[in-house]
Amino acid sequence: MWIKIIDGEINKPKLVNLDYVSCIFPDDDGIHLVMSDGCVLISISKEYPYNKLCEILTKSSN
């Protein structure tokens, strides 16, 4: 599943494939999405808060 987040490092929209997200965790600067290749994206999207991302990832893994 693809979603559009606001990338906190460049402050611009970025498409992210949630199938490649290994884990997520909240931090002071946003929600960190650890990708399967080890890359870390920082989402500052108000549309996808931590709880909503957890819910989406749980549903997509089933």
Language-model regions, residue ranges each:
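Acidic, Ser/Thr- and proline-rich intrinsically disordered linker/docking segments
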Residues: M1-K14, Y20-N62
